[in-house]
Amino acid sequence: MNVLTNFPYQHVLVLGLAKSGTAAANVLLQNHIQVTINDGMATLEDATVQKLQTMGAELVLGSHPISVLDGKDLIVKNPGIRYDNVIVEEAQRRGIPVISEVELVHYLTNQPVIGITGSNGKTTTTTLITEMLDRSNVSVKVAGNIGVVATEVASSLQSDEKMVMELSSFQLQGIDQLQFSTAVLLNLFEAHLDYHGSFENYVEAKCNIFKSQNKHDYLIYNADDDNVSAAIKTAEATKVPFSSSRPLADGAWMDDDFLYYKDEKIIAIRDIVLVGKHNMENILAAIATAKLNGATNEGIVQVLTTFSGVKHRLEFVGVINGRYIYNDSKATNILATKKALAAFNKNVVLLAGGLDRGNTFEELIPYLHHVKAMVVFGETAGKLKDAGVAANIPVIEKALDVQHAVEVAFALTDEQDTILLSPACASWDQYKTFEERGDMFIQALHRLK
């Protein structure tokens, strides 16, 4: 196990357990740091809490008294707890540093750490980079907002291994010294404003991914995104751009037929399994990152000719009875469904609907021109039907749920057509999670084989 090195704190408050708080408390206790755990929901009946108490943690459960800050010199905050929380605000007033669990990686390993962030595409890009390195026989472990908690991975990282981390703005706001050997900034648009308070604060949190980098590190960035280009001006790292719109002498780019890294042709677009312009951007970022970290062209091509997407994110399910099936259940908002529709150019049957958050769907209308039929379901079925009528879609059917929508869609399609589940809505009117909705979609498909 790797130990905390040059860790200057003696008595740490872990605020909020869940996965990241539990992992942080474990690492701190194993390194003989005094730990107090404060969680409003956990109880002494919880086996995890009992284990941490046995290891020596002091427990303050069920409430958040200000007194938990007394004698503490560091707060490790669960990413889900906002900075306007009364404990966090008081800690900052007292000058006590507040970090997220991922910052502990700085004290646990000197191995290269690759960090990926952005408003969209993080999981797909992180997965692509990890797979490209693995197929190129580069030892790598994935962590962060995807996979295993970062401190758990860093604690066991070997001297020949690299670490790849997906990072949210919540996590990045709580880092200070963690240095990424390669940082990836995919895109920036308004998101999580309820948490950060403003777009400027959100961008500032995202930019923490490169604030500790120096000229020996790499910053992979989207040269087509004006917000990104403005944000990285102060970065000290060696900047490596990617673009889906123009050639680049010093980065990853594409034309109508091929993807390139600098002047090197990597792969024909027709050979790539993933679809969609947004996925081409993710792939370009992954290629640049992988090449800089030892990936071979052979390894990169192996991944791109077989990788069908992260589950529920415009995932290619397969060809069933001649129909091409895509599961984009993660599309819980209109923007995501617009991007999914833009990935196809003809003969799409769209399955959409879900929780009604008060949205109208006029924004979708320009993206429905190649949709031959819609199957709508859930609370928003009526609103989506109105959008379909406005787009002159010839056939619009209403289904009871996703499973029923699959049956209806097959009756409306011919061989070579595409069936796309991209709901444009959250799932909570009928399903617990978007994952459950996607799984029900796939199960219904398999029953038709």
Swiss-Prot record:
Catalytic activity line of the entry: UDP-N-acetyl-alpha-D-muramoyl-L-alanine + D-glutamate + ATP = UDP-N-acetyl-alpha-D-muramoyl-L-alanyl-D-glutamate + ADP + phosphate + H(+)
Gene3D superfamilies in the record: Mur ligase, C-terminal domain, Mur-like, catalytic domain, NAD(P)-binding Rossmann-like Domain
Compartment(s): Cytoplasm
Cystine pairings recorded for this chain: none
Record's keyword annotation contains Transcription: no
GO molecular function, one term: ATP binding
Database matches in Pfam families: Mur_ligase_C (PF02875), Mur_ligase_M (PF08245), MurD-like_N (PF21799)
Keywords: ATP-binding, Cell cycle, Cell division, Cell shape, Cell wall biogenesis/degradation, Cytoplasm, Ligase, Nucleotide-binding, Peptidoglycan synthesis
GO CC, one annotated term: cytoplasm
Protein's pathway: Cell wall biogenesis; peptidoglycan biosynthesis
Enzyme class: ligase
Keyword Cytoplasm: yes
InterPro entries, per the entry: Mur-like_cat_sf (IPR036565), Mur_ligase_C (IPR004101), Mur_ligase_C_dom_sf (IPR036615), Mur_ligase_cen (IPR013221), MurD (IPR005762)
One GO term of the biological process aspect: peptidoglycan biosynthetic process
Superkingdom of origin organism: Bacteria
UniProt: ATP binding residues: G118, S119, N120, G121, K122, T123, T124
EC number of this enzyme: 6.3.2.9
Family classification: Belongs to the MurCDEF family.
Function of the protein: Cell wall formation. Catalyzes the addition of glutamate to the nucleotide precursor UDP-N-acetylmuramoyl-L-alanine (UMA).
PANTHER family documented for this protein: UDP-N-ACETYLMURAMOYLALANINE--D-GLUTAMATE LIGASE
Record's protein name: UDP-N-acetylmuramoylalanine--D-glutamate ligase
Lineage of origin: Bacteria, Bacillati, Bacillota, Bacilli, Bacillales
Gene: murD
